[in-house]
Amino acid sequence: MEKISEIQKICLRRAIVFPTAEIYGGISGFFDYGEIGKKIKDKIIAELKKFFKEENFIEIEGSIILPKEVFKASGHLDSFVDPIVKCKNCNSYFRADHLIEEKLKIKVEGKSIEEIDRIIKENKIKCPNCNSELENVKEFNLMFKLTVGAENEAYLRPETAQNIFIDFKRIYFGYGAKLPFAIMQVGYSFRNEISPRQFLI
């Protein structure tokens, strides 16, 4: 953690990477790249592309906005969720599974919302900020919802893989209908995290 803290200080001091909208207080988990940061990022991407192109991957660039139907078919609408809990007093939100792991040192991955809620109540886990009681655990979908046009429901893609899957047939026939072949994509994906990272790592 000390090394990460030192790297962060250097990045801030030299304007390599810094919080978005910093002069207005910023927003947790969002960062801008200065010139050096952008060059480092571009070099990493160039090396990744070089590696995959040498392995004969086909590169695509898909839309970052996809219709609701894509995520209904993939299961993201129902299962791309985190269990969250709200403090009754200070109104802070927390990842319920993280609270349990920190307090009880047990993993709850795969457990239902009801099971996670029961564990919190039985072990009297309180708000880490003010030590008050917590509300019931609920599901929080990690995708950013959009309206395209007047009423078309869509989402920012939470992973770059969606475009590869939905474009597979088009790419397959466009490149001679021969197997095997591989597709790659470098781009942005979007997740509405309850506890965003404090830095890039």
Which stretches of residues belong to each language-model region?
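TRNA-recognition modules of translation machinery and tRNA-sensing kinases, especially anticodon-binding
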Residues: 2-201
